[in-house]
UniProtKB/Swiss-Prot annotation:
Subunit structure: Monomer.
Intervals of motif 'KMSKS' region: 593-597
Upper lineage: Bacteria, Bacillati, Bacillota, Bacilli, Bacillales
GO process terms (BP): isoleucyl-tRNA aminoacylation
PANTHER family: ISOLEUCINE--TRNA LIGASE, MITOCHONDRIAL, SOLEUCYL-TRNA SYNTHETASE
InterPro entries the record matches: aa-tRNA-synth_I_CS, aa-tRNA-synth_Ia, Anticodon_Ile_BEm, Ile-tRNA-ligase, Ile-tRNA-ligase_type1, Ile-tRNA_ligase, M/V/L/I-tRNA-synth_anticd-bd, Rossmann-like_a/b/a_fold
Organism of derivation: Bacillus cereus (strain ZK / E33L)
Binding site residues for ATP: K596
Descriptive protein name: Isoleucine--tRNA ligase 1
Enzyme class, broadest EC rank: ligase
Catalytic reaction annotation: tRNA(Ile) + L-isoleucine + ATP = L-isoleucyl-tRNA(Ile) + AMP + diphosphate
Residue positions binding L-isoleucyl-5'-AMP: E552
Length: 921
């Protein structure tokens, strides 16, 4: 007889190798055929809603690792919620207006100057839709379950119509106004920028100290002094109309040779050192407030420079006398307004100086620095010129420096509802908790929001102007424009004349001749995506406002979290979200930012093509995503190893359940052995721990708990000793069916627990599980932890056994290394435990030699009675020797019963019995 044919070895068609790059697309096709998204929505219909609102990625180019991290995190949450009593719809979105799309078309050779704005915008829309399609397929390849056929796209007519309504509501409440103000201006984009569209990079700038002679000392100064200002933007000096001093600071009149200079007293030493003054002495001090309304002369123009008081003046750097150009700085503008100065801005849209800067007209602002500095030197006003490298705002899209420039713009008045904004921040749940402080400070400190852009591709600002210049924004005009956009899209604004965009028969007292013109600026793209709570959450039947969660990268505190909050509070008085969760950025393996120049960019597509989507998803679950995270080939290799371990665990479980029918073979819990019940207690602990981790969005805890359970509880213990029963005993042996009962519970629970993270693998495992009826594991609920009778006592006892078992394993390892034994089944062990452990061992009814995977087990005396040379551990001394007898051909146990049965000379007594009872006819 071939005894190997009498072993019940694992049998399953579940493949050992994942081959995910090939298998996942097939699984995704299956999901598409069965309409998995709709099926899940149908299955969870009527449950409480959980809405995670998708912040729209920008529709341009392939998805990057930041996109992958973001979408996968969202998918974890949505999948988990739909398996725990919620209906969790997930509607993906795209942000589709803005400069990058205009630039992409220009780079493709589109000559926008040769076509109308409406024609150019049509090309922008086509390009945006192509990009949406491209990204949609890549997101689907990640295994993200979403309503991919019905996303929201910010350029769609229905969306734009709602955005117009949001603008109209804000205008009606008096929150929208037009004003001349310095705004961030990008000469390369030829447009105003919002704070969220700037980034700081190092820039080399001229650093100059300039003397402004006193013209009128107002009896405080003698008239022969000079104010010293410091600036790193010489090009703004043609726009200088004043000097600001702090009312509370003390100012010194410093005599240096034959000159007298005015600077803040506490900066005397610093300035003296910088300007290399020798023999400088302070001849007089005055308070800043006394210098108000004194007048200085502009260094190279025949005009006055008024001395004003400003709280923005600091002594961190410079001289305490601040060059003030109301057309080129927010503080300058505020102070200038208070003192009635004009807003002079001699720089055009392209960053070129105009005729209002005589002598420098036609020069690009940055190129004007040198001639202006030379002019200062020529007139004797330049006291010092050096160059410094400092952090300076840049256009986040063109990566070029920006300027402050006063222009006529449309603004949303944050000041008008700042208090409500701060209250809304306080009522929101923030994860991490520091998010609250971050957004609170941003809202507290931000100025009014410049919402107009001088570009073509975006949603038009729905404002008309009467003949007398009055802006027109009424309920009637807003509703009419919204209806037009809903029907024709926003391009209608650029295709029709103003009068054809107004309601029929519309009149206005400012237009006696019935003539009107329309605004040509468009809205900031942050106003687009920031209106999604109205256009998506409020409008779609399957969603609701406020959303339960917004989840984006930490750059969105100043972006989408902020703009959404502003429009929602302005319109509804409430935040659009109950909770906000943020994640960090993806860096390379060395913690460096990914960039083309370094060549360290990791692309999601490459990972999916080489390793598979589930490996990428498992990586997402393994990192502390609330901070910046790292990815590299080595890191992915480690993750792939963990995946292999999880997959092998599934395969082992399936293989050993091949002949198990849950309806017939399940053993009641009360009839299970203690060790089997202990495994169920461990499983229940796992279920509790994993669900708690999912609830708190701690996916790394899910990853570690599942990995440890597969490795430590199953592989190293339960599955290891269980082989001796599963393979060796007869099919229906009670111990074998007991273990299979536990393995079945473990398999079903484990498959469900990994589903949010490894959906492809979980759905691959599912149909192989005996007795399951659901079409997909996604149509099931998370397992419930069951409280077993006496669980605590059982856990205490068997945890103690496990610590003792660790001691035994160490002793066996030593014996192996010393060549006392080959493998552990060659061993005979005698234990000399502590009193406590002895009592515990004596209370175990299971076959201890099976649990220790040895051929002989004896309980000796107490620890102190152990032979002197026996290795002693914390809980026991262990004597390891060769087991006596011969090795059984079938079970590999060393036994003195080999050959007792003459018909089966090479088998031990146990195996001979099993063979006779089950295989001999």
């Amino acid at each position: 007889m071939e005894y190997k044919n009498t072993l019940l070895m694992p049998k399953t068609e579940f493949p050992m190798r994942g081959n995910l790059p090939k298998r996942e697309p097939a699984m995704q096709e299956k999901w598409a055929e069965m309409n998995i998204y709709e099926k899940v929505q149908e299955h969870t219909k009527g449950r409480p809603l959980f809405v995670l609102h998708d912040g729209p990625p920008y529709a341009n180019g392939d998805i990057h690792m930041g996109h992958a991290l973001n979408k996968v995190l969202k998918d974890f949450i949505v999948r988990y919620k739909s398996m725990t009593g919620f209906c969790a719809p997930y509607v993906p979105g795209w942000d589709t207006h803005g400069l990058p799309i205009e630039q992409a078309l220009t780079n493709k050779g589109v000559k926008r100057k040769e076509m109308t704005v409406a024609e150019f915008r049509k090309l922008c829309a086509e390009y945006a839709y192509e990009q949406v399609e491209r990204q949609r397929e890549q997101f689907k390849r990640l295994g993200v379950r979403a309503d991919w056929d019905n996303p929201y796209i910010t350029l769609e007519p229905a969306y734009e119509a709602q955005q117009i309504k949001v603008f109209g509501d804000m205008a009606k409440k008096g929150y929208i106004y037009k004003g001349q103000k310095p705004v961030y201006w990008s000469p390369t984009s030829e447009s105003a920028l919002a704070e969220a569209e700037i980034e700081y990079q190092d820039k080399k700038s001229a650093s100059i100290y300039v003397a402004f002679p006193v013209k009128d000392g107002k009896n405080v100064l003698e008239g022969d002094e000079k104010y010293i200002i410091w600036t790193t933007t010489p090009w703004t000096l043609p726009a200088n109309l004043g000097i600001s001093v702090h009312p509370e600071l003390e100012y010194a009149i410093v005599k240096v040779n034959d000159e007298k200079y005015i600077i803040a007293s506490e900066l005397f030493e610093t300035v003296a050192k910088t300007l290399e003054w020798e023999n400088a002495e302070v001849v007089k001090t005055v308070k800043g407030s006394e210098l108000e309304y004194t007048v200085a002369k502009h260094p190279f123009y025949d005009r006055d420079s008024l001395v004003m008081l400003g709280d923005h003046v600091t002594t961190d750097a410079g001289t305490g006398c601040v060059h003030t150009a109301p057309g080129h700085g927010e503080d300058d503008f505020i102070v200038g307004k208070k003192y009635g100065l004009e807003v002079l801005c001699p720089v055009d849209d392209k960053g070129v100086l105009t005729e209002e800067a005589p002598g420098f007209e036609g020069l690009f602002y940055d190129k004007a620095n040198k001639p202006i500095t030379e002019k200062l030197e020529e007139v004797g006003a330049l006291l010092k010129l050096t160059f410094i490298t400092h952090s300076y705002p840049h256009d986040w899209r063109t990566k070029k420096p920006i300027i402050f420039r006063a222009t006529a713009q449309w603004f949303a008045s944050i000041e008008a509802f700042r208090k409500e904004l701060l209250e809304a921040v306080a009522e929101t749940k923030w994860v991490p908790a520091w998010g609250e402080t971050r957004l609170h400070n941003m809202v507290r400190d931000r100025g009014d929001w410049c919402i107009s852009r001088q570009r073509a591709w975006g949603v038009p600002i729905p404002v008309f102007y009467a003949e007398n210049g009055d802006p027109i924004i009424t309920d009637e005009t807003i509703n009419h424009v919204a209806d037009l956009f809903r029907e024709h899209g926003s391009n209608v604004w650029f295709e029709r004349e103003a009068k054809d965009l107004l309601p029929e028969g519309f009149t206005h007292q400012g237009s006696p001749n019935g003539e009107f013109r329309k605004e040509t600026d468009i809205m900031d793209v942050w106003f687009d995506s920031g209106s999604s709570h109205q256009a998506v959450l409020e409008e779609r039947d399957d969603l609701q406002r406020p959303a339960d969660l917004y989840l984006e990268g930490s750059d969105q505190y100043r972006g989408w979290f902020n703009s959404s909050l502003s429009t929602a509070v302005a319109v509804t008085g409430k935040a659009p979200y109950k909770g906000v969760l943020s994640h960090g950025f993806v860096l390379d393996g060395e913690g460096r930012k990914m960039s083309k120049s370094i060549g360290n960019i990791v692309v999601p597509k490459k990972i999916m093509d080489q390793l598979g989507g589930d490996i990428l998803r498992l990586w997402v679950s393994s990192v502390d995503y609330q901070s910046d995270v790292r990815i590299s080939d080595d890191i992915l290799k480690q993750v792939a190893e963990v995946y292999r371990k999880i997959r092998n665990t599934f395969r082992f479980l399936l293989g050993n359940l091949d002949d198990f029918k849950p309806s017939e073979n399940t053993v009641a819990v009360a009839e299970l052995r203690e060790v089997d019940r202990y495994m169920l207690v461990k499983l229940n602990d796992l279920i509790t721990k994993v669900k708690e981790a999912y609830e708190t969005y701690d996916f790394a805890a899910v990853y570690h708990a599942i990995h440890n359970f597969c490795t430590i509880d199953l592989s190293s213990f339960y599955l290891d000793f269980a082989k001796d029963i599963l393979y060796i005993e007869g099919a229906n042996h009670e111990d074998r069916r007991a273990i299979q009962t536990v393995l079945y519970d473990v398999l079903v629970a484990l498959t469900k627990l990994v589903t949010p993270i490894l959906p492809h693998t979980a759905d691959e495992v599912w149909p192989y599980i005996p007795g399951v009826t659901e079409e997909s594991v996604q149509l099931t609920d998370m397992p419930e932890a069951v409280q077993l009778d006496g669980a605590e006592a059982l856990k205490t006892k068997w945890d103690a056994f496990m610590t003792l078992r660790d001691d035994v394993l160490k002793a066996l390892e030593v014996a192996r290394n010393e060549k006392v034994i080959g493998k552990s089944l060659n061993a005979s062990i005698t234990l000399y435990p502590t009193a406590e452990m002895k009592a515990m061992l004596e209370s175990i009814n299971e076959d201890l030699k099976q649990l220790f995977i040895v051929s002989e087990y004896k309980l000796g005396g107490m620890m102190e009675e152990a032979p002197a040379d026996a290795p002693k551990y914390e809980h026991t001394a262990v004597v390891v020797a060769q087991a006596t007898g011969e090795t059984c051909e079938r079970c590999w146990v060393v036994s003195e019963t080999i050959g007792k049965d003459a018909e089966h000379e090479t088998l031990c007594e146990r195996c001979a019995t099993v063979v006779k009872e089950n295989y001999v006819k």
